[in-house]
């Protein structure tokens, strides 16, 4: 009949005190109620349109009632939209969420903030028909423009023509912004401000027109400022922020960015002062490289192969400095364990034999060299370890490690912990680490022991890793970062593996794979064991370890 | 058929119709003289058609299911008919549908009417959604009486153009299926205009949309009237052209060198943009460019618009104002699809959902907003621009008492209305603000004194819109009371009342020559009224929902109107025909504005975009192009999305760019 059921009419009648409403009367009234409601709504919609709105509000209904000379219903024109709640148990019955408010609460509540006054802001929506890419404008066009340039690039390359409007409309604000960022990057005096700047770079929507300027800036400064460690680090942070910014379409500029990043990874010398921790910079750059490869590898198919070729060349060239080797190893390691297995492990044996003399304090007189060699050794070990860890992790989760095994692992930790002390002696003399850091590393084994007793489960598993990995542990300057790194290594590796091995292997396929890989991995493990001795063991997940042992 | 049967039919019919006594009389009469030979004046025996017809009368006259059956049969027949004639036949369906529905409602079969309506409403929702929404609420015979829309539908006939063959097809069908009910409805409510030849293409359907037939007749009749759409004699544009010649003579030596510059100017401005110089510089550059273009202007206006005499006594313009306008005109840059305008976007922030309307003065220096809390706020953009450097503004505040009477406020607050303000517009020189409100009044404010000058009472319902004439002094208003009125500033009584719209008059706009006003209404029509006589001289039919915005081209030849659905229609005033619908917006078109030369149309919409349309090309489009159907895309030049900000008002300023403002909610 009508959408207003007669029961509703009856209920309303009761609520206003009419108890003896005949059912027939209710039935007659129902269609009329619907008609009147529609009439009011029609007028309310007119009011809404003239208020230039597209959502109907209570005030529009009041306006419509006014038009019909009906007294408006008071108490609803609160401004905000109503919250409707679904009545439980009914499909399409709603009621307004009208909570009871305690008078005391209202009185005691602090005064609300005064509402902001109306203001006008002005900006250019378009300049001669072109929409400038400023934060006030919707970022739609901005993102689309580079895609077009890419297409043109591929077709017939009138690149300049198409990109011109974007450059052309570089507003004064953007220029100031760019200048400020550049200054901050160069000045290295105000770290908190610089951090803010990086956050802004990573999140602002209107920055797209500045991207070519930033890439240029970074390329220039990296090539000029190889001696300035702080600057390089700042620049790499900018790169990372730009990569993080979801509004920036950085693809067309990658070819400009990559050389700078790779330079920071495998350059012979980064920074001129002794204290400059270029290892950290290399690690950071390695992460950047892997990020870029992961995100844009699918678009630029040659990207990863070119990159790995560069890195492998750097690694396998014995004339290159150890620092360069280190960078190359870190870069390759960051690309995932498949890369490591294919490119590093295959070359591991000859390389280690080459590295051996450098490690030995008797043969190599230069302390610095020894230190570097150990760094490289550590990086290699880590890469290999993560690789084998990743491989073993492919196996489906086995039952959780038995406590007895944990003890075994700890036992090993103890056994090997003699090693680092030896090495540290050699390192300490040459290394100018901060005392505090050294303290941590010195404390390492003891701390583990005490924790072993107290028995905090997650730490127990990870701490041996730290111990058993002496080169990393003893020489890593930011030990805290490294420690967390090591802590995460297990979980992260799991993730890396998952994403890396994205070819969806079904459970059954996994099982097949296991038996095939089992031998393979076993062999690999044995080989690594030969090369590294017991140091590789902590990388092997405990359960698998029990299998292999 | 023997007389006995006939008697039965007649008696049955009378009983059905409720004439029981007459039926009894008849029966008794027949019993008395049983021979019954007196009835056979018509030869029923040889006319089976007629027999069936009569039989159907006596059969279940009241049965509501017959409507459903008849309609669904007709529908399936129409949908299965020949493709060539199908769209014509389908036009019949809508009137039949709504009249079936109203018949059912009228006879009290509310339940059946509802189910009938719901089962077939999908067919017509595309085109007639708004009407259906209105009709849906009609549930009892009294509603039919009460609702104006339904009444007008019942009273009038629908005109449908039919080609000869379609008409025959339809008649044939109706006769062969003996669907007397449908035949009755069609006869009663549809007026066929049969023409010979091939059926028209389906794209011409626009005229088929409007349902009120007699209305169409009057519209056609009215549209025969002559109108003088030309510009005024001795207008400033005229004078400019005269003086422009002189100017270009005197500047000839200079002008030639400038011409060369002008060609370069495009390049130069892009260079400047690259270097990122300030906006001011850009403006200056354009201004320099513009003087060179004035000379060109003459050559372009090959066919000048005809000149007419003003029918109103127009106010005398002071020489200062005249000079400044002339200056502006000279500086005007010709916009086209190649030379796109710049758009300056004013955003109202912190309006708390209260901004109802906004407008920009002709020179772009003032911006006014009308709010639902009865207030009007006026911003002086020049002052905001000056103090734009942020920190300085705060310091200036205390010293700048005259501008900011309430201390920290950056705008002038005008209080006086007692209901939501629905429009606020500036007089052409920008010294007055006219506002209209839900409190049924129109108020005149002075921007110099920041005070209310006059309150005009006359409308009986909320005044939706008020607009100054292009020369000031006179203004037009329109209201929920279905009238539009003409006022002059010095009288508190309206000079003219334009009545005729069938529903609210939602927007009003002056013709550039001041002799006409156009009104857009909720009855989906746009009307043009003669200001002097107060008569309606044009009715523009074609919109499918309420008309929200109007704009007149500067040469007075065309008009654009935007509606609730986002359709913009371009009309030729002299023929009252739609030149082209401009589709693209998908929500209400709040405002429209022509560029100074009339070559571009800007539209602002609730879908948070500003669109620019090339209207010169659309008027010159050949028939063939129009048939391709992709002409829409050609006309839409640019779309500027905003950051989810509905666009409320647009003004193409004299100089060179469009200004738009809007609100963040």
From Swiss-Prot, chain A:
GO MF annotation terms: protein heterodimerization activity; RNA polymerase II general transcription initiation factor activity
Tissue expression from the record: Expressed in roots, leaves, inflorescences and siliques.
Gene name of the record: TAF6
Name the UniProt record assigns to this protein: Transcription initiation factor TFIID subunit 6
Region of interest (Disordered), ranges: 399-501
Regions of compositional bias (Low complexity) in chain numbering: 467-482
Xref: CDD domains: HFD_TAF6, TAF6C
Compositionally biased tracts (Polar residues): 427-436
Self-association and partners: Component of the TFIID complex. TFIID is composed of TATA binding protein (TBP) and a number of TBP-associated factors (TAFs) whose MWs range from 14-217 kDa.
Residue positions, PTM Phosphoserine: 434
Keywords from the named record: Activator, Nucleus, Phosphoprotein, Transcription, Transcription regulation
Record field: compositional bias (Basic and acidic residues): 489-501
GO cellular component terms, semicolon-separated: SAGA complex; SLIK (SAGA-like) complex; transcription factor TFIID complex
InterPro entries with a match to the protein in the record: ARM-type_fold, Histone-fold, TAF6, TAF6_C, TAF6_C_sf, TAF_TATA-bd_Histone-like_dom
Histone-fold domain mapped to chain residues: 5-78
Function: TAFs are components of the transcription factor IID (TFIID) complex that is essential for mediating regulation of RNA polymerase transcription. Required for proper pollen function. May stabilize the interaction of TFIID with selected promoters. Not redundant with TAF6B.
Disruption phenotype annotation: Lethal when homozygote. Reduced pollen tube growth when heterozygote.
Coiled-coil blocks: none
